[in-house]
From Swiss-Prot:
SMART domains: IGc2 (SM00408), ITAM (SM00077)
Protein name: T-cell surface glycoprotein CD3 epsilon chain
Annotated Gene Ontology cellular component terms: alpha-beta T cell receptor complex; external side of plasma membrane
Biological source species: Bos taurus (Bovine)
Disulfide bonds: C43-C84
Function: Part of the TCR-CD3 complex present on T-lymphocyte cell surface that plays an essential role in adaptive immune response. When antigen presenting cells (APCs) activate T-cell receptor (TCR), TCR-mediated signals are transmitted across the cell membrane by the CD3 chains CD3D, CD3E, CD3G and CD3Z. All CD3 chains contain immunoreceptor tyrosine-based activation motifs (ITAMs) in their cytoplasmic domain. Upon TCR engagement, these motifs become phosphorylated by Src family protein tyrosine kinases LCK and FYN, resulting in the activation of downstream signaling pathways.
Record lineage: Eukaryota, Metazoa, Chordata, Craniata, Vertebrata
Length: 192
């Protein structure tokens, strides 16, 4: 057998042995249920006697049974280590959980599917409104009176009107006369 295959087989055997060993020690998790500002803990172990509860290593008086119901839960006061245990003689069997929960009176629980549905519906409504405005403005543009091309401000047509002479030019911008030799009458040639 080649060395590479031997190492693979040995690694596979170690993984299988580790998985079997882990199954024997695996503990069931606590069940935690939060509704409004009430928190309910369910002890995962099946004890034969009466189950007692501790919070931060202090006995909780009046709380016995598989379920612990904490009403008016406060994150500041009630967060910490919770332990369900049973005492048999002088031997104690316990199961511990650290709990830190935020609760509120008027909260609503929303799952992922509801959030996705809300987002998709929002996008569809937005696109629908966008198309509605687009087609409304397009139909409005088609109904509007057509504008003649080249019409300027005031509805005056451009170009030469045969019934009226052209406007008198502004004297400030009078063209330079050919016979006049003023300073700015022409361009001077510079010596190169």
């Amino acid at each position: 057998m080649q060395s590479g295959n031997l190492w693979r087989a040995l690694g596979l055997c170690l993984l299988l042995v580790g998985a079997w060993a882990q199954d024997a020690d695996e503990q069931k998790p606590y069940e935690v249920s939060i509704s409004g500002n009430t928190v309910e803990l369910t002890c995962p172990r099946e004890f034969e006697g009466e189950i007692h509860w501790k919070q931060n290593d202090e006995q909780m008086k009046g709380y016995t049974g598989k379920q612990l119901l904490l009403e008016n839960f406060s994150e500041m006061d009630n967060s910490g280590y919770y332990q369900c245990y049973m005492t048999e003689g002088n031997k104690e069997a316990a199961h511990t959980l650290y709990l830190k929960a935020r609760v509120c009176q008027n909260c609503m629980e929303v799952n992922l599917m509801e959030v996705a549905t809300i987002i998709v519906v929002d996008i569809c409504v937005t696109l629908g409104l966008l198309l509605l405005v687009y087609y409304w403005s397009k139909s409005r543009k088609a109904k509007a009176s057509p504008m003649t091309r080249g019409a300027g401000a005031g509805g005056r047509p451009r170009g030469q009107n045969k019934g009226r002479p052209p406007p008198v030019p502004n004297p400030d911008y009078e063209p330079i006369r050919k016979g006049q030799r003023d300073l700015y009458a022409g361009l001077n040639q510079r010596g190169v």
